[in-house]
């Protein structure tokens, strides 16, 4: 049985003003519970950010300062206008394209698959999901109306209610089913199988 050193896994979570509160906090929390090295990076010109519902988050660092670093996973929360801000940030777009080309995991939830990953050009021909009202934006993809969709190294999810399943899926991708179960059990998530 392969033993994965969770702390050796690095995750980048870019956030902006207007990122979706529950998605951002769920991703940060669950991935840190899995003992990953999670870097929360501001796409704005300051570290203190205000999410879509008013939750304030202080980023660990500035996004442009860490884009040259290696990450096992880059994951974008949704929410508007946060996802749009991430979608329009060309240095992030190029970094996610590099991640995709290298066969490393990249992920997004809610509006972010439609307004960021699709804009970056990393979803063509992929099976994906997003916030249902935005699926028309996903031209050139195979939209699936499912909570979480994994297609190779691309992982997408629908929205706030699917954020926990999405985060646990990302834990499993990076550290295996046992780590997913350990994190889920500690959070009192009922076992599904």
Locations of regions flagged by a protein language model:
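Short, Lys/Arg-enriched N-terminal segments with co-localized hydrophobic residues
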Residues: 1-6
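Active-site-adjacent pocket-lining segments in enzyme domains
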Residues: 8-15, 19, 30-42, 59-193
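Short N-terminal binding/cap micro-motifs at the start of the first secondary-structure element
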Residues: 19-24, 48
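Short glycine/proline-centered loop/turn elements that form peptide/ligand docking sites
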Residues: 25, 42-45
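A cross-family phosphate/adenosyl-ligand binding-site feature
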Residues: 48-60
């Amino acid at each position: 049985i392969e033993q994965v050193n969770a702390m050796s896994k690095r995750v980048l979570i870019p956030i902006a003003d207007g990122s979706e509160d529950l998605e951002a906090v769920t991703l940060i929390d669950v991935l840190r519970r899995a003992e990953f090295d999670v870097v929360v990076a501001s796409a704005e010109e300051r570290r203190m950010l205000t999410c879509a519902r008013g939750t304030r988050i202080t980023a660990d660092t500035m996004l442009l300062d860490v884009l040259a670093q290696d990450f096992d996973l880059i994951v974008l929360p949704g929410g508007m206008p946060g996802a749009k801000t991430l979608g329009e940030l060309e240095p992030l777009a190029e970094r996610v394209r590099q991640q995709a080309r290298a066969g490393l995991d990249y992920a997004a939830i809610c509006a972010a698959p439609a307004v960021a990953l699709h804009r970056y050009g990393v979803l063509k021909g992929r099976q994906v999901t997003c916030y249902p009202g935005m699926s028309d934006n996903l031209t050139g993809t195979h939209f699936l109306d499912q909570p979480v969709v994994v297609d190779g190294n691309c992982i997408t999810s629908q929205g706030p209610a699917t954020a926990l399943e999405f985060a646990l899926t990302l834990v499993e991708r990076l550290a295996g089913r046992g780590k997913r179960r350990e994190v889920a059990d500690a959070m009192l998530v009922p076992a599904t199988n």
